Amino acid sequence: MSAPVARLDDVHLSFAGVKAVNGVSFEVNPGELFAIIGPNGAGKTSLFNVLSGVYRPQQGSVRFLGEDILGRRPFRIAAMGMARTFQNIALFEHLTVLDNLMLGRHQHIGYGAAAAFLWRGKARNQELEHRRFVEEIVDFLELEAWRSLPVGLLPYGVQKRVELGRALAMEPKLLLLDEPVAGMNLEETEDTARYILDIRDELDVPIIMVEHDMGLVMDLADRIMVVDFGTPITTGTPAEVQQHPDVIRAYLGEEIGS
């Protein structure tokens, strides 16, 4: 069996004595879509911040691609191949779709400022390669109609798609999706669900997803972990989670049981 892409063991994180993450352990395997669910304030985003190096837990271990990443700075972890989208869109609104996607290539740029200024040799060749790669993302996410427009002029759902594309431009080995369909209408949600599955199945990128849309989670996830006040309740397949009495009572109720 392949080694886990990411693994947390007995992670504890507190702020001023308040437990944000309380004894969480899980692993994400190659090709897997692993979802984390729970109410607001359950510690889901804190777990993403632990994984990506924004927060350092007081206890526990965090491994990515077999390496201990506890204490590494976020840009170092990103350079290893961990990409992330956010609840709130974090794009440069005055830049075009293509320019925003190109920003995701920054860690793959191997030429200096002088070469870039002179636009010759290695800089020119690499720039062309990066643009070809970004154009493939435009095709993959069906962004052709907006490729040259400033992001600030685009509909919300398309902006979320651009943010997803920028994460893909990093060539991630693990993709963290923080509420990828928040605020979307039904059509946008269905489109995003399709792109997420294509990322997992066609690009073979494992995914950790935090999401409040229970229907989406149950349809897409291979496994789900449920947390409450930072404490894990259960981890299992969607079918197993749906049958867990504490999950039904506390979070899902009749939404998935009916």
Task: Identify the residue ranges that each predicted region occupies.
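Glycine-rich phosphate-binding loops of nucleotide-dependent enzymes
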Residues: 2-258
